[in-house]
A protein has these predicted regions:
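HAD-like aspartate-dependent phosphatase fold
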Residues: 1-134
């Protein structure tokens, strides 16, 4: 599979929706994101958060082992003016607000890698109870 640019929403997708607070991580969210990065896909955090709330989300992801290529832009430190479109150019958008809702990270992985399972080391990094109940 070729390398993809994947725009990923935060609230309701990476974590349970608890905005403005940060919800609990969605089941397999960080395991899947790490595996996608290992597959050399470019991940962009694509969220409505801004200011301090955005920084908290970025830091939360970093603390959970996921560093995004860019945040709310196509490239790191991309200068945006009010005339620029805020739309992120991506091959794939992962968001809880898409048609049909968010299918879950296990289904995201199966859609992208139908013949593969998540890498075992990612699955074993947390016990089943911790993955299910945080």
């Amino acid at each position: 599979m070729r390398s993809l640019i994947i725009a990923v929403d935060f609230d309701g997708t990476v974590v349970e929706d608890a905005y403005p607070r940060i919800g609990k991580p969605q089941l397999f969210a960080f395991e899947t994101l790490k595996a996608l990065k290992q597959e050399r896909h470019r991940l962009i955090l694509w969220t409505c958060r801004k200011g301090q709330s955005l920084q908290e989300a970025v830091e939360f992801c970093r603390e959970n082992g996921v560093e995004f290529f860019a945040v709310n832009s196509n490239f790191p430190d991309e200068p945006l003016t009010p005339e620029d479109s805020p739309k992120i150019v991506a091959d794939l958008y992962i968001d809880d607000r898409n048609l049909g809702g968010f299918p879950g990270w296990d289904q995201v992985w199966k859609m992208l890698k139908p013949d593969d399972e998540l890498p075992e080391e990612e699955m074993r990094s947390k016990g089943i109870f911790q993955r299910l109940f945080g």
